[in-house]
A protein has these predicted regions:
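N-terminal nucleotide-binding beta1-loop-alpha1 segment
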Residues: 1-23
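A short, N-terminal amphipathic alpha-helix
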Residues: 36-52
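Short, high-confidence coil segments that cap the C-terminus of an alpha-helix
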Residues: 52, 118, 144-148
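Short beta-strand/loop segment that forms part of the nucleotide-sugar
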Residues: 53-63
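Short phosphate-binding loop-to-helix
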Residues: 67-119
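Short beta-strand-to-loop acidic/aromatic patch adjacent to the donor-nucleotide binding site
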Residues: 118-127
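Conserved donor-nucleotide/metal-binding helix-loop-beta segment in metal-dependent transferases, i.e.
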Residues: 129-155
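Conserved alpha/beta core of the MobA/IspD/sugar-nucleotide pyrophosphorylase nucleotidyltransferase superfamily
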Residues: 180, 184-262
Length: 262
């Protein structure tokens, strides 16, 4: 352990026929794989810029640990003069996990960090291409005053994204990795007189709406002149969408021909 701080990137079921995400009903495996790899690299690129923090990449199943290794190698080749990327391999550990519900895996990751002696722990998705390094750094910084950092969900709930080691009860009071009632959670924390901070950090992709949301975020960043965000996402996303549209059109034409033939 080189630092008191740790950032855990959780790669939830990257892609595969045995663990289909809802979005795979629309897009085929190979294009979803390329898209999520790009999202992961962008996320890792930003997290690498957070100083004084170790990084752990939790991958399920363990056979996909190559995802983390490949991403580090690829980023190092793409940015050979980048100091933050140059030191990425030395401060990163890859954790292989069994395929289990995300909440169960999150608790396992939390236990690993606590047993390793980390004081400040950030749990976040590995697929957040719109994240900024400042947001992750803020999550760690806020832990100096607040024992718990909550992340909002688009459904109006919340979940635990960061906590201090002196507040292990947070794991049982706040849902980890899944939605829970915002009111119930904040009331429970209030009764225990635990100070918490909310930060928009852990966004994940699991539905078609998520991809559309990310496209809007990338377009907004480009409109406001932020060229750093989405270093490789935009190109891959564009190619991904083009290929998907071609596939959808071909499928539609095929159906029409079949209907005509019949």
């Amino acid at each position: 352990m080189a630092s008191r701080n740790v950032i855990i990137l959780q790669l939830r079921n990257p892609v595969g026929k045995e663990e289909p995400l809802p979005v795979l009903r629309v897009y085929d495996d190979i294009h979803m794989l390329r898209l999520k790899r790009a999202f992961f690299e962008d996320t890792l690129y930003q997290v690498a810029r957070v100083e004084n923090a170790d990084i752990k990449i939790a991958v399920a199943p363990p056979s996909r640990s190559v995802w983390g290794k490949d991403a580090i190698v690829h980023l190092t080749k793409r940015f050979p003069d980048d100091h933050a990327i140059a030191g990425l391999a030395a401060r990163t550990e890859i954790i292989g996990q069994g395929v289990a519900p995300i909440e169960e895996r999150s608790r396992e990751n939390l236990e690993i960090a606590l047993k390793a002696g980390y004081r400040n722990i950030v749990l976040m998705s590995g697929y957040v291409p719109t994240v900024r390094s400042e947001q992750v750094a803020d999550a760690l910084r806020y832990l100096s005053e607040h024992k718990i950092i909550l992340g909002p969900t688009i459904e109006g709930g919340c979940y635990l994204v960061a906590m201090r080691s002196d507040c292990p009860e947070a794991a049982s009071m706040v849902s980890i990795g899944t939605d829970t009632s915002y009111r119930d959670t904040t009331e429970a924390l209030g009764k225990k007189k635990l100070k918490w901070q909310e930060i928009d950090l852990s966004y994940d992709i699991s539905h078609q709406e998520d991809i559309e949301f990310i496209v809007r975020e990338i377009n907004h960043a480009r409109f406001t002149g932020d060229e750093e965000i989405g270093q490789c996402t935009e190109a891959v996303l564009s190619e991904f969408m083009d290929e998907s549209e071609k596939k959808a059109k071909a499928t539609s034409n095929g159906r029409n021909r079949t209907a005509t033939d019949e």
